[in-house]
């Protein structure tokens, strides 16, 4: 039976994906959010989903309300629902109930969730009818689907309502210092989550913290080293992607190619292969569809403006920065790697300042944008982007949206824009600068 859903905070990456999924399943969907443009809204607009400004008038008694995790009692729509005792569900609670209708495949981990969820979704949907929800704002819903692939987020332990049949865990790392107290707290959260997985876990076997995880379901380890249950080996990394074989219990289960770059993407693919092997999916079909994966939004997304290569990536943690730069060097080994990075949240910048500097030193030159504070925090003046610049050994300087012209001081370069805030504003300024230079030279 068709329902009407109203999403409070519909532009959030998970929320927009869920909205698209429910829309495609035949339900009426609308939502509200701030006016500021966010990259997820294009997909919503293309689907014909109405996006409204926040207003009490948006809510009617016949609707099912789904509320984004960032929106609290100070939001006018949430306050209205509470005042009038209109029931609503948080995103993660709704998802926990929704997945019960499917055989579910979850992807958790500090880094690589979205890319791995995208890869798993791509392969499975090309083999059989599959619904999926990806953290880049992409979702697909089918009422006839047997399988459901989704991203499982550890922040504020939002993954605790989830009880999937299968789950990949890509890694454990200290992040979200505004919530987690340290690496032990992060590990404990993942351990609690792992205990809820029903059939099997697929865990990166070279992560010391992950190896401490215990769960009732079988745990399969994947990685590069002997001793793992699924081992990627005979690896060739080229400018066209990565080729490798995977063996399980001493037997080769397939030879694979992914048109993706960086060691981390080989690991992501190996996790997907391991999960689908245990789930009984034909490895020849898996190999066929791995070859055609085109990536996910804001994860090593490339464009060329007037012969200048620009890469856009969501990387906002030191581990992710290192992985993104590694991928850029694999694809463009003869080019200078110029990193343009915007720190995301003051708490993360303070907690990981030294690690950020070390990671950014992997680039040849570094430009920094002003720190992007989250809606949950206040700038107390405890850290400035200049503090990070001072710790970077490679050539570095701070740029503004209004003046990105220092980026032109490079020949034969690849420009890698990284961040989870509004780094795309800097990217767009640079693109406009390049376009104007071309016009002036004509």
Swiss-Prot record:
Enzyme Commission code:
6.3.2.8
Enumerate the Gene Ontology biological process terms: cell division; cell wall organization; peptidoglycan biosynthetic process; regulation of cell shape
InterPro entries membership: Mur-like_cat_sf (IPR036565), Mur_ligase_C (IPR004101), Mur_ligase_C_dom_sf (IPR036615), Mur_ligase_cen (IPR013221), Mur_ligase_N (IPR000713), MurCDEF_pg_biosynth (IPR050061), UDP-N-AcMur_Ala_ligase_MurC (IPR005758)
Give the matching SUPFAM superfamilies.
MurCD N-terminal domain, MurD-like peptide ligases, catalytic domain, MurD-like peptide ligases, peptide-binding domain
Spell out the molecular function terms from Gene Ontology: ATP binding; UDP-N-acetylmuramate-L-alanine ligase activity
Q: Name one Pfam family in it.
A: Mur_ligase_C
User: Pathway listed for it?
Assistant: Cell wall biogenesis; peptidoglycan biosynthesis
Summarizing the function annotation, the protein's role is: Cell wall formation.
HAMAP family, per this entry?
A: MurC (MF_00046)
Q: What is this protein called?
A: UDP-N-acetylmuramate--L-alanine ligase
This protein's gene is called murC
